[in-house]
């Protein structure tokens, strides 16, 4: 379910957010589905409950989830989830950096493009199987 890399430059908090976003955007966490409680998730992924709470608050701020007091945190309607301009710019920058790395490694533009399309197709196929 979660992939946390303790050696990553990204904080654990950011990695928790990224993992949950991916689960939501790929449909593995369905609209209206209740997320594990802060305590449950922190125990499952062995992180501090404050880290999970902070991630849940940020996901709520971004519109990925909503919280009902005393009931829990739930996945928001995917059709209403919109990445903000900052996130889109960051994702585009990461893609650009990876693409330039392919070219730096000596691949042609067409070879790099083929790899990008292959990765996108693999992602789509794995999402279809879930």
Task: Show where each model-derived region lies.
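A short alpha-helical element within helix-turn-helix/winged-helix DNA-binding domains
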Residues: 34-45, 59
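Residue cluster at the C-terminal edge of the helix-turn-helix DNA-binding motif
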Residues: 44, 61-64, 122
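Short, cationic-aromatic polyanion-contact patches
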Residues: 13, 37, 71-88
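Extreme N-terminal segment that seeds HTH/winged-HTH DNA-binding domains in transcriptional regulators
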Residues: 1-34, 40, 89-93, 99-126
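Beta-hairpin "wing" of winged helix-turn-helix
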Residues: 28-29, 33, 61-70, 76-78
């Amino acid at each position: 379910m979660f992939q946390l890399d303790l050696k990553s430059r990204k904080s654990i908090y950011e990695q928790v957010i990224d993992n949950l976003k991916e689960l939501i955007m790929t449909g593995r966490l369905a609209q209206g589905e209740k997320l594990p409680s802060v305590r449950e998730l922190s125990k499952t992924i062995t992180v501090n409950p404050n880290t999970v709470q902070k991630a849940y608050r940020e996901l709520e701020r971004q519109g990925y989830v909503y919280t009902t007091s005393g009931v829990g945190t739930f996945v928001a309607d995917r059709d209403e989830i919109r990445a903000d301009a900052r996130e889109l710019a960051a994702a585009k920058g990461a893609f650009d950096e990876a693409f330039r790395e392919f070219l730096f490694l000596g691949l042609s533009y067409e070879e790099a493009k083929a790899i990008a399309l292959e990765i996108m197709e693999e992602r789509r196929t794995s999402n279809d199987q879930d």
